[in-house]
Each structure stands twice: as structure tokens, then as C-alpha cells.
Amino acid sequence: MDWEEGAKNTVKSREVTLSQLQAKKNKKKSVHNRKGMSDYDRVLTAYNYLRSNCIYAYRGWQYNYANTAWGALVYGEAQCSGYARAMKALCDAIGVDCRYVHADSKASNPSHQWNQVRVGDKWCILDAQSGGFLLGSRTWKKKAGMSWDTKGLPTCNMTDYKK
């Protein structure tokens, strides 16, 4: 994959960057994705891994590619977009359905980004940057003040996931 000047949602490098990201994803998959784990346990493990190995990039998204999965997984520093992209990459690696979601203009923070993940047959909100784990859409809207365009996204449960 060649990087193009001004391209969105890409990592500013070529094979080296992609191979580093793939190595992180593969390490995460091989170390933490045990045979027979439930969707819940796989998502929880990926979530805990990201929360334990990445800090919020207060300097801004432009440092250490903090708005990319690479910034979160390789540099260990990200903003919400980097956390959400890293969570998507980890879920892809461990075989869990995951969507990347961006707040709309009516949200308390219109630039915020997070994920929707499927655990069993239920879709829930997951925000590794802020600490939201398997929340229902009602909780996410009420407590975090988030709203988003749901077109093209699976319908989330209204209530939080209970194991």
C-alpha cells in the first residue's frame, strides 16, 4: 500500500509501518486469544490490552500518529480516533465484529470516535479511550452525551451488556 500525500485514514509510511502494526496485532492475537474464549472474553482482553498499553496523546493527534492504530499499538499513544482504530484492528485480528463510529454534530463532543462491537448476538458501545466497556446506547447517550448517525451501523442494545 503506497501512502499518498493528503490521504485520510492512512499511516504515513509504507511496508515498515504496516509490518510493525501487523506484528503487534499478531502478537496480541497469539498471546491473548486462547482457543475456546468467548466473544466477551476476547473483547475484554483486547480492551484491557489497549487500555494498559496506550496513553492519551495530550500533545495532539499530529504527534506519533496519535490518530491511527499504529500510534496506539506501536507508540502507545493515541487520541480517541487512534484508540478506536486500534480497537478495530485488534477485533479484526481476533475475529470479533467491530465498527468504527464517529460522533455527529449534536454530540457533546462532535469530534469523538469510538467502536461498536458484537458480543454474541448483541452490539454494544466500546470506548477504550474513555473507559466505556460494552455500554448500551441509552447509557452512552445519557452519560456521555453522545449521538451519531446510525445509518449503515448495526443497532446497539439499549442497555449495558451483562455477562
PLM regions: where:
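Short, low-complexity, Pro/Ser/Thr/Gly-rich segments in the mature regions of secreted, periplasmic
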Residues: W148-K162
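Secondary-structure boundary elements
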Residues: S13-A72
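Hydrophobic/aromatic-rich core segments of domains that either
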Residues: G82-S147
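Long, amphipathic alpha-helical segments that form or neighbor coiled-coils/leucine zippers used
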Residues: G6-T10
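A glycine-rich, coil/turn loop motif that links secondary-structure elements
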Residues: Y63, A72-G76, S105-S108
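Active-site nucleophilic cysteine motif
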Residues: R42-A46, G76-C91
